[in-house]
Amino acid sequence: MSTPTFSVADIRKTFLDFFAAKGHTVVASSPLVPGNDPTLMFTNSGMVQFKDVFLGTDKRPYVRATSVQTCLRAGGKHNDLENVGYTARHHTFFEMLGNWSFGDYFKRESLKWAWELLTEVYKLPPERLLATVYAEDDEAYDIWTKEIGLPPERVIRIGDNKGGRYKSDNFWMMADTGPCGPCSEIFYDHGEHIAGGPPGSPDEDGDRFIEIWNNVFMQFDMDEQGNVKPLPAPCVDTGMGLERLAAILQHVHSNYEIDLFDALIKAAARETGTSDLTNPSLKVIADHIRATAFLVADGVIPSNEGRGYVQRRIVRRAIRHGYKLGRKTPFFHKLVQDLVQQMGDAYPKIREQQARITDVLRVEEERFFETLAHGMEILDSALAGGAKTLPGDVAFKLHDTYGFPLDLTNDVCRERGVNVDEAGFATAMEHQKSTARAAGKFKMDRALEYTGAANQFTGYEQLAESAKIVALYVDGTSTAALHAGQSGVVVLDRTPFYAESGGQVGDQGTIGAGSACFTVADTQKIKADVYGHHGTLEAGTLNVGDTVQAQVDLQLRAATMRNHSVTHLMHKALREVLGDHVQQKGSLVNAERTRFDFAHNAPLTAAQIREIERLVNAEVLANTDTNARLMDIESAQKTGAMMLFGEKYGETVRVLDIGTSRELCGGTHVRRTGDIGLFKVVAEGGVAAGVRRIEAVTGENALAYLQSLESTVDQAAAALKAPPAELTARIGGALDQIKTLEKELAALKGKLASSQGDELAGQAVDVKGIKVLAARLEGADAKTLRETMDKLKDKLKTAAIVLAAVDGDKVQLAAGVTADSIGRVKAGDLVNFVAAQVGGKGGGKPDMAMAGGTNAAALPQALAAVQGWVGERI
């Protein structure tokens, strides 16, 4: 059987049309930034936008769906960045073809339709295909062998090959618990001339057998013990990589040889002045322009954190590869126009935002080019001596001074067979962070020269203390006196002020004598046992040797103690609820709240948070005494006291018992757990790979938080005219009504535009044998413009048509030319003629093109000129 050649555009359309004919609703691609999953950095599969449906928290007006989803894998768990350009199939950005069943059809239809599409529509040779099933999934195996007719030797059972029950390449789980089930993957055999073995064999990682389609059957619900039970409404989730399928259908072995990439690679070669179209750097650039442009379209701007930093890394990696090819001036942003030509029809948002995308990438490119050449000189110099490892401090300098992301430096070094000292890089990074933290403190701590005796901390028992001034500092320099209006540092021989340590902030308060009043804004350690009180002398004069009264701010200290004590209880509760793997990774305790970072690899569920709150508040209600004891480190260990991994402890430590918690701690705490009053979690999220952060409030702040929530609920109830207890149902009903109205509105717009289209056909003017029509459709969107265009072309037979829609100042344009007329008039030329007059530009195919503009006032004149323009060209 000869396999026909399909373009990427053909593959998309054929896939969607096939499943639409099978009763599936065609759903648009969701943005690369997930709207329903804050735990996920980027959309990395087609099912992401349906996750809430699978979890039962959302219901759609359809039970069958199909989509072509834009995806990104760069950063976090799914990171293909370093492989892009060097393999045949790795991408940062890719498109995923998918179809879904939400409690409707199941394995039989899913597998049979997949086989039908691949062999009867795409015309793939059946003898080139094989499938895998989960070893225990006899149903799928029988469908393949007995109903579809795939020979048993080409249906491979894959068992638990990942070290545990249900841990298998052919058993899919959404998370550690919840919906899961077996999957069946379809592979394409490229032939014996390609190295590699079938799936499940020792040589399965070769390139001969390539997975093209995965059919996931979510039929079970897994509990925390790993037991599964059937779901009441099994679902289907399938995914097929568009680029992989295109390579097969276009008879090439690499994804980078398909038509879409061929065009982008040639564009990259044009902009970099390169003639070798096989150069891996061109593949990198072609891949990265897709990723970065779509990220900008979805609102991700290059920055130094989060998604923005991933965007910056991708942009700068592309720029570096252009630089490697000899391009020493900005070029990358110029590829946006080529990308729009290739993908603008399928994804109108990149055409609509073409100017903005280009501008964002241009600014980032210009910024990096300012330092790129100098950074490369430093890198070249460091590697000139034949060293096999780039020092970590050099890698950090490139990162810190010249904007080289570490993976970019790794990229350069990998090409030269050189390793990067990443541990040294991490050390330099931490040193900079420590320096930055220190610079953010008041200029008073370890930079101050103090040679006197240690001070005595009395703040565990006293909040007011008579003390003597033993040192004063202004602007970091020792002084004998401090005068009114001056800011400085006061050191006392004894102090009730707690100096920042162990995550607890330093105390505030006052130091005074007679008319002199010094307001303490912060307390920091000058040495381990010497505390510096930073602040401002509001009145009078303070001298070294003066006897003063030191008074801690009672309200702030009490609130801070509540939050510190509850942190211990929360730490214990976290370990009880989540497991003993929970370890403290950082904390901040002040008067407003407690912030606690801990090791855990998954978001906390609402039920887990509620259980943590229950456990902690039970300890609060028990109102047990807090007990602190000093003992040697060995004795403390024997008591079972919690010690923080990586923390350095002295020979004598302070063991704190609060409720059922026992930890080593030098902080200040409440006398009884009941003093905490109330505990409420207010936030939970991820801060790094494997690290979560939880924030909570206590006492008056917890009460204020709950009162604020209550006020919000009351306002919402008043707005919806419903009692608070009925809010959830009322909101759900309102959302359902909105969805229904939106659907009805879309249908009405379509009908209105369609009826306008029927009327407009009579307005067409014959120009030298071609019916010419230029008109505005009220209330139409891009989809309606295209649909109306198709109807008018069918009706007018031989025609050149321009349709426009207006939304505020924005103009959307569609141009269409019938097949028998494209030799005389091109839709792209026609749409750009009109677009240029309304402040825009566009493009497309000879028979259909789209454009946008920003000057709606100029539209009537532009449309009026179409007839003359067509007449001149034919």
Swiss-Prot record:
It is found in: Cytoplasm. One of its GO terms (cellular component) is cytosol. Keywords: Aminoacyl-tRNA synthetase, ATP-binding, Cytoplasm, Ligase, Metal-binding, Nucleotide-binding, Protein biosynthesis, RNA-binding, tRNA-binding, Zinc. Zn(2+) binds at residues 564, 568, 665, 669. Pfam families: DHHA1, tRNA-synt_2c, tRNA_SAD. GO terms for molecular function: alanine-tRNA ligase activity; aminoacyl-tRNA deacylase activity; ATP binding; tRNA binding; zinc ion binding. Gene3D superfamilies: 2.40.30.130, 3.10.310.40, 3.30.54.20, 6.10.250.550, Bira Bifunctional Protein, Domain 2 (3.30.930.10), Threonyl-trna Synthetase, Chain A, domain 2 (3.30.980.10). Binds 1 zinc ion per subunit. It catalyses: tRNA(Ala) + L-alanine + ATP = L-alanyl-tRNA(Ala) + AMP + diphosphate. Its cofactor is Zn(2+). Its main location: cytoplasm. InterPro entries: aa-tRNA-synth_II/BPL/LPL, Ala-tRNA-lgiase_IIc, Ala-tRNA-ligase_IIc_anticod-bd, Ala-tRNA-synth_IIc_core, Ala-tRNA-synth_IIc_N, Ala-tRNA_ligase, Ala_tRNA_ligase_euk/bac, DHHA1_dom. NCBIfam families: alaS. Belongs to the class-II aminoacyl-tRNA synthetase family. Catalyzes the attachment of alanine to tRNA(Ala) in a two-step reaction: alanine is first activated by ATP to form Ala-AMP and then transferred to the acceptor end of tRNA(Ala). Also edits incorrectly charged Ser-tRNA(Ala) and Gly-tRNA(Ala) via its editing domain. Consists of three domains; the N-terminal catalytic domain, the editing domain and the C-terminal C-Ala domain. The editing domain removes incorrectly charged amino acids, while the C-Ala domain, along with tRNA(Ala), serves as a bridge to cooperatively bring together the editing and aminoacylation centers thus stimulating deacylation of misacylated tRNAs. This is Alanine--tRNA ligase. It comes from Acidovorax sp. (strain JS42). The gene is alaS.
